[in-house]
Amino acid sequence: AIYGSRSFTALQDFIRASAAEAGVEVELFQSNHEGAIVDAIQAAYGTADGIVINPAAYTHTSVAILDALKAVALPAVEVHLSDVSAREPFRQISYAGMACVKTYMGLGFEGYRQAILYLKQYLEEANA
């Protein structure tokens, strides 16, 4: 299976545990609707220090998500469970990634932990 066999609930639990281990607060959001994702990104402005995002298939199609990430100007890290670069040619462009400081792909759930740790370090260095 491209995305593995673990459940979305297991992923949420993993992210919460990874954030707690790193000593950071996390708010989780998931939607299959592009506009709702844009709204969530915009809502992060002034309330979050950074964003970890898996834009899924919108990675390759959504200029709206790219624009929202640019507009809020928060450091963002892109995560993909699978190695998108080894997949179909149409998956080679990441619009969201153009607004991100780092991308993790092909690491499964571990990519989220790496993204949290990277973002924490990035913010600490930026605020030093």
Residue ranges and their predicted role:
Residues 43, 62-71:
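Short Gly/Thr/Asp-enriched flexible loops that form oxyanion-binding sites at enzyme active sites
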Residues 25-35:
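Short beta->alpha junction loops
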Residues 105-128:
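A charged, well-structured terminal subsegment
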Residues 44-51:
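Short acidic/histidine-rich motifs immediately flanking catalytic phosphotransfer sites
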Residues 56-59, 82-84:
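Short glycine-rich anion-binding loops that position phosphate/pyrophosphate groups of nucleotides
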Residues 91-109:
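Short beta-strand elements at the ligand-binding edges of bilobed clamshell
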Residues 70-87:
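Short, acidic/small-residue loops that bind anionic groups at enzyme active sites
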Residues 1-22:
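Glycine-rich phosphate/diphosphate-binding loop of Rossmann-like nucleotide-binding domains
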